[in-house]
């Protein structure tokens, strides 16, 4: 009896050398130690099932895994194992983004033919855990807006209904439309994994010259100024032109301005009185929009030099406004913009009544 008990104890100790859900150990090169249960072992019998099983391991960010291949033809299995590694790395979103290589060990587990899988990642575990989910491009854009608002330097997201998008242009547009949020336009680097498909990982890196802490402090200063501007023209009893003019006064009389370019345009303009034509036009347009007034930023030239100015709306009419024209708040029609050149097709005609949209219903 003592000999039998000793043998049973030895068997129990040996079973501790087999795989569990997190990792596996192998005492011999080509044998997978048996366990008491096979509930956690998926069974695969063809390439699609093999791909899905390996993909599931990668999806979880697991380092090791295993699968039963009891019903898999041995000749096909050997060929498919070498192919599935390439397929996962090239075709699967997480595989393309984070997997360096995949190793396989053919043996037995729970008395069945099985394959052990070891995944070697090129990314740290926290990077994999930090991937955000986006069901479509609208959600992806929301995540980008949140990243810019928080002044974060990176966003990695998995977009399951991916569409080709100019992310650099999207960041530039958001920054131009929200100078109360984006203090500095970052340098944007975008990588997409894999190269094709509807399900992809998008890795966006944002490089700032200013520290995140400083950018957040700038936001705290700038945002109340925009709120004050809205309150300054909160009376809707005043006509649109009066409100545009009041916002002009609010901005232009705030500082004795020096016309220079800054990497933090809205903050430098509102706090230090330093800004260029682009900063004035962008900040003024944002103040107008937050007050419920329609306002565009126009990019063009004046006498051959780069120039930005605004277009505002009064009823059915649009007008040009150049805050740095040295002439005060004056509304201009298109034919009065001497020396200015812009893309006429990109903006509404100014000084001409707008035609109502045709109703095809």
Predicted regions and their residues:
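N-terminal accessory/pre-domain segments preceding catalytic cores
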Residues: 18-236, 350-361
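Hydrophobic/aromatic-rich core segments of domains that either
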Residues: 279-346
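Periplasmic OmpA-like peptidoglycan-binding domain that tethers envelope proteins to the cell wall
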Residues: 269-278
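Alpha-helix N-cap recognition
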Residues: 43-49, 133-136, 262-265, 332-334, ...
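Secondary-structure boundary elements
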Residues: 210-270
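Mature secreted bioactive peptide module from preproproteins
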Residues: 169, 173, 177, 201-203, ...
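C-terminal motif of bacterial Sec signal peptides marking the signal peptidase cleavage site
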Residues: 13-16
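Positively charged n-region of N-terminal signal peptides that target proteins for export
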Residues: 1-4, 8
